[in-house]
Structure formats: C-alpha cells, structure tokens
Amino acid sequence: MRKSQRRTISGRTAVITGAASGIGRALAQRLSAHSCPVAIADIDEKGLKETEASLHAPTLLRVLDVADAEAQRDFAAEVRDWAPRPLGAVFNNAGVATSSSVLDAVPEDDDWLWNINFHGVVNGTRAFLPILVEQDEGAIVNTSSVFGLVGMPNQSAYCSAKFAVRGFTDSLRQELRGTGVTAINVHPGGINTNIVRNARWRKDPEGRGRTQDQMVQEFAAITLTQPDKAAEIIHRGVEQGKARILVGPDAYLFDTLGRLAPTRYYDLLGQLESVLRRRSRASAAAEMTVS
C-alpha cells in the first residue's frame, strides 16, 4: 500500500474561496494563526472584510465570483505576484445550496448551484494548478460534501454537483501521481454555517409548510461540528497527506452506511433517526419528572 505523503502547509501561502463566513473564514483564521499569508476570496465583500479584520498574517482580499473563469485566472495571477511565500494549498471551498424535488426544481436555481459548487471548483483548480505544478509542491483542496458520498431526497442538484467535485478531484489526483502536488477531497457533514440561510428556497421541499427561518433553526439544531473544528480537521488532514478528509461524526456515519448498504442507507438512517427521537423524548420526559 502506498504511504500517504505528509506535507507542511503551515507558514506557506494559502488561497481560500468562500472565506466570508463558515468553514472558509475558520480556515483563514486557523492558517493565519499558523503563520500562513492568506489570499481570501468571496462574492460577499462585507463578510470578506470582516474575515480580513480577524486575521494576523499578510492578507490579500479579492471580491470574486468563482463561477467566472476569467476572474479566477486574474485572481491566480494576482496571488502569484503578491504571495510572500510559496503556495502551500488552494482551498476551493465556496458553495451554495438549494432544496427541491426533481419535479419542482427550478432550472435557474440548479444552474446557479452548479456554476458555483462544481464549475467554481474546476475554475479555481485550473487557475492555480499551473503555479503548484511549476513549484512541484502543494495541494488542491476541494470541498465536496457528505452528500458527495450518498444521495439524499430533495437534494438532486446539490448531490450531483458534490459527486462531480469528488470525481473531478479523484481523477486529478491520479493525473498528479509522481509529482509533488496532490488533490484532496473534503467531505463535511453538518457544519454550523450560513449555507442554509443563504440557500435558494422556493417552498418547503418536504411539504410541511416550514419557512426558511424555521429550516435554518432545524439545521442549526442538528449540526454536530463548528466551523473552527472543521478547519482544524481539514488543516490536519492536509498535512497528514490524506486523499479524502471526512469532517464530523455524521460524515463518518454516512460514509460507513454508504459503503455497507449502498442501496439501503437511507432506510437505515430513517430507523436510526426514529431511535434517536424516541431516546430524546424519553430523556426530556425523565428530566420533567425529576424537576
């Protein structure tokens, strides 16, 4: 078995898209604290400036639509000229969400998601890869998702884009064999970020009449991992030379169920959810009795 190639990115320049909030902001903060000059990009200028204000290392800020291939190439050229140290890693992290059944899906929403979640990753990879290849070291780190491991209802656009990121990154990694450059897939589970708040919702995909604010609250209640912990896991995984980084206990659960029961994992998840709900109700009832 081929051993993982350990690498050090601390102290080297890092590029991070989707850095205005969530995992991207947490990565910028963590890597900045590990002496990395950071080039941060996002379409949200206000959030990006808030991230910049929290950093303690040389920073390059760029308002960027990752779906714009030419803008990505311009950003890469700017980073090449600016970077005070060799490039250690490029984190193609920007992402958005939608939710609807296949029949209710709005094509414009699906295109919007795909242009950011998949083509944004491709654009960033193609823009920065020549720099890494030239220096013969570094990592392309692409954010897929736990939904790039298993398919889920009402998430056909999101799942398909994240599966595409996974396949693209795995293929690229094979192309880079024998070089000092690698490509890494990141599969976050439920992370407490703004992705649901910023998603495009037309109506409750489950037909329960929930508002977007209610769905945001439900998502926050089930997230198991905070962004700073996700950033720690990703940073450590890159330096350990992992080809795939699972973020959060739910990511490991989905990965395991997808491997063991590739056609029945959703049924098993439903059974597990029922058990957890019963335990939660029983625990709440016991607390009321004691009080």
Model regions: which residues?
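Canonical Rossmann dinucleotide-binding motif of NAD(H)/NADP(H)-dependent dehydrogenases/reductases
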Residues: S4-V38
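The beta1-alpha1 cofactor-binding region of Rossmann-like NAD(H)/NADP(H)-dependent oxidoreductases
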Residues: E45-K46, V63-D74, P107
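Substrate-binding pocket helix/loop in short-chain dehydrogenase/reductase
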Residues: S101-V102, V106-W114
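Active-site loop immediately N-terminal to the catalytic Tyr-X3-Lys motif
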Residues: L103, V150-A157
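Active-site helix of classical SDR
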Residues: T125, A161
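Residue(s) in the substrate-gating loop at a strand-loop-helix junction
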Residues: S145
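SDR active-site lid
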Residues: G178-P249
